[in-house]
Amino acid sequence: MWVERDGGQLCDWGKRKEIMRRVIISIIGVSLAVAAAGQDSQDQHQSFDVNVPQAPLPVLSDGRVMLAYELHITNFTRGKLQLMELRVLAGESGRTIADFRNQDLIDRISIVGAPAQSPTGSVVAPGARAIVFIELQLAPGERLSALRHELDYGLPDGTVSTLRPEATSVSMRPASVLGPPLRGGPWVAVHDPTWPSGHRRVTYTMGGKVRLPGRFAVDWVGTDAAGRISTGDPDHPSDSIGYNADVLAGADAEVAAVRDNMTESTSIQHNPAHVLGEGAGNFVALRLGPDRVAFYEHLRPGSIRVRAGEHVRKGQVIGSLGFSGDTTGPHLHLHVADCDQTLQCEGVPFTIEAMSLLGRYHNIADLGQHPWSTEVVRKPGSPEWPSYNVVVRFPSPLQVRSTHEASRVVLSNVSALGPAMHMPGQAHYEQQ
């Protein structure tokens, strides 16, 4: 090694060569990184934040296993994004379970903050959130532990991109099995996931979290063989078929909460609006098990026969069907939730045993005017969640007692299958 005096400085050419080598390598590395970043920038852009706040829970309905859940999709970009197509895939096999596009997708979208009665379309503005309501029917015998989603969306420049969020786990917890909430019939299970202001789509944000208590809520409306819902003045609650009918406990349970201090309007047409939290009217909440509470709402004033902390037996009369709270007509609201608060819980599925299916109203506007369609007449072999607007008949009091005795024997042999489950709600029983 040798050194040279240059301008008064000693230059170690070995070190100089090493420094130059490192500089060249650094320049090449930076150039490659810039080139790579330029290439990536052509493929990368901001998109949606996708969240599934409540894991899908399976339930038997219409003879098939179904799932009901929501995708919360928030636009964090500075431009409008358009939802174009949503595919739901089985997490294990990759099989396409559902493919929503065009009007079918638009009908499932609710833009947070938009008027409930106005069409929201599929365009999500910057900072806005869309909720996509999803109902799936699985293939016979199919069991899923996870779901995957593929979302095609349009960018402001007209290009289309595909978003593939992380897989969503499917809960394996079984639905709670309830006894009949009423006797006899016919009773119409009024609910429909497509109604903009129906239980299925009414969210509440309290305590810093958005929840959907009425995800599986059912409103039971009494009718007769001709499809009428009133035997006298249609504006008088007491003339409604089903008014004052006994409401039955669906399980051996502890009474978690009771409210019985609300009056009823004497006019259906002029029933006043109620403040948030009083829409359920008079109600009884039964604790079925860990994180599972059944709500029986809109009960007649003075009819509740139980108090908080008491224990009730399956089939025991707990109150009477009424017209208290926010409702467009006398009915029994039933849902199951994961806590004992009417609005601060997540709705979970439940099934009802010992009911016979008489038919269905394909257009709920026909209820009160015409008989139902009878093409779905059957008696389920297993407890089911009542499907949309089906008409059912429950056992008579004598049949209820015999059914309860038989179910105690069956349940004693299958207690290892796991705890029960339920769900919450609070909305009108008519299409909004």
Residue ranges and their predicted role:
Residues Q137-V177:
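Terminal connector regions
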Residues A253-V255, G309-L321:
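A structural signal for short beta-strand/turn segments enriched in small hydrophobics and glycine
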Residues G242, E254-R300:
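Zn2+-dependent peptidoglycan hydrolase active-site motif and core
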Residues R292-G315:
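Short histidine-centered loop motifs in beta-beta connectors
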Residues A98-G141:
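Intrinsically disordered, low-complexity Pro/Gly/Ser/Thr-rich segments with frequent PxxP/GP/PP motifs
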Residues I73-K80:
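Asparagine-centered strand-capping/turn motif at beta-strand->loop junctions
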Residues M172-H191, G198-V202, T231, H274-E278, ...:
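Acidic, glycine-rich catalytic/binding loops that coordinate metals and/or anionic ligands
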Residues P53, G63-E70:
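Short, solvent-exposed loop/turn segments enriched in Ser/Thr/Gly
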